[in-house]
Amino acid sequence: MSRIVLDTNIIVSALLQPVGLPAQIFVLALGGPLQLCVSANIYAEYEEVISRPRFKRSEEIIASALRAIREKGFWVRPTTRLHVCADPDDNMFLECAQAARVEYLVTGNLKHFPPIWESTRIVTARQRLRSSRLFVHVPDHVFEVG
C-alpha cells in the first residue's frame, strides 16, 4: 500500500467535484491501494476549510468526509518542524510526509512546494493516477450520509 498526503485543496476539490481526479485520489486513499496519512494539524485544516460556507457542502457531507478521514487515515505525529515552503502553513504537509515516509504528496498547487522533499514526490492528482495507472469508478455520491 502506497502512503500519500493530500493537500487541503485536493479534499476541497473532491467534495466540490465528486467525479473529478481529486475525488478519485481521495476514494483510493480511503479504501484502495493508497493510504492517506494525516496529522492533527492537517486534519484541523481540512475541517476548518471544508466547513467554510462558500463551499456550500451540507453538514452531512462534511461530517461523512471527516469521519472517513478520522477512521481510515493513518495518523502520524510529526516531530520535526520544517521551514521549506513560502507559505508557512504548507510546511505541515511536508512534515507529515516526512514523518510517515510517504511516496507522494498530492496537491493542486505544485508551485507551493518543492518538486521533491527527501523521498516524497510532490505531484498533481492526474500525475499520481497516471504514475501507477490507478483508476477508480467514483459514484455520484462519494460519501454516504449516516
Region spans (language model):
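Short secondary-structure boundary segments
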Residues: 8, 40, 108-110
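Membrane interface segments of multi-pass transport proteins and intramembrane proteases
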Residues: 55-56
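Active-site neighborhoods of divalent-metal-dependent phosphate/nucleic-acid chemistry enzymes
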Residues: 71-110
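Short, well-structured alpha-helical segments
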Residues: 59-70
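PIN/NYN-family metal-dependent endoribonuclease catalytic core
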Residues: 5-6, 16, 21-51
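Acidic, PIN/NYN-like endoribonuclease modules and their adjacent C-terminal/linker elements
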Residues: 91, 98-104, 110-146
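Residues that mark the start of a beta-strand
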Residues: 1-3
